[in-house]
UniProtKB/Swiss-Prot annotation:
Its cofactor is [2Fe-2S] cluster. GO terms for molecular function: 2 iron, 2 sulfur cluster binding; glyceraldehyde oxidoreductase activity; metal ion binding; oxidoreductase activity, acting on the aldehyde or oxo group of donors. Keywords: 2Fe-2S, Cytoplasm, Iron, Iron-sulfur, Metal-binding, Oxidoreductase. NCBIfam families: glyceraldDH_gamma (NF041020). It is an enzyme of class 1 (oxidoreductase). Optimum pH is 6.7. At pH 6.7, glyceraldehyde is the predominant substrate, however at pH 7.5 the dehydrogenase exhibits activity preferentially towards the aliphatic aldehydes such as formaldehyde, acetaldehyde and propionaldehyde. Its main location: cytoplasm. This is Glyceraldehyde dehydrogenase small chain. The lineage of its organism: Archaea, Thermoproteota, Thermoprotei, Sulfolobales, Sulfolobaceae.
Length: 163
């Protein structure tokens, strides 16, 4: 069991987007706050802070997680990918391209989480049906788009990733 004296931080060492970071934080620090405030990776958003909306979704040790549900201390030693880790050499990832080309965002607040969930989902389901897409992103809420173009974008992204 982790014992922390009053006023002491816990050491969190994580590899995020290929870079190792080591920080001392309060044991109550949420992973999403660690990512945004300690690492400055503000692409990951906080929508509800209660595991409902999915705006904070990142990949942790190969699985998508809602990072407002995980303590930073629980992520110690983990490999994490955030939205900033998807593009390379200033080139958008095919999923990001598909979201852009299918007008799958409006305000964009849900988009990083939606794309990270899509990234995970398409690894598990490289050639999904529309129904599987809808099921795969059901934990991510979008207040703007009505989901239609998001579903189209995920199906388009699956084609791009297969070609
Ligand atoms: S901010 Fe994490 S699920 Fe909404
Ligand atoms: S684009 Fe605005 S919440 Fe999804």
């Amino acid at each position: 069991m982790l014992v922390v004296k009053k006023g002491e931080g816990v050491k969190v060492r994580v590899r995020v987007n290929g870079v190792w970071y080591e920080k001392y934080v309060s044991p109550r620090t949420l992973l999403v706050d660690f990512i945004r405030d300690e690492l400055g990776l503000t692409g990951t958003k906080v929508g509800c802070d209660t595991t409902t909306c999915g705006a904070c979704t990142v990949i942790m040790n190969g699985k998508s997680v809602k990072s407002c549900t995980v303590l930073a201390a629980q992520a110690d030693g983990a490999e994490i990918t955030t939205i900033e880790g998807l593009s390379s050499d200033s080139k958008l990832h095919p999923i990001q391209e598909a979201f852009k080309d299918n007008f799958a965002l409006q305000c964009g607040f849900c988009t990083a989480g939606m794309i990270m969930q899509t990234y995970f989902f398409l690894k598990e389901h490289p050639n999904p049906t529309e129904e599987e897409v809808r099921d795969g992103i059901h934990g991510n809420i979008c207040r703007c788009t009505g989901y239609q173009n998001i579903v189209k974008a995920v199906l388009d992204a699956s084609k791009r990733l297969r070609s």
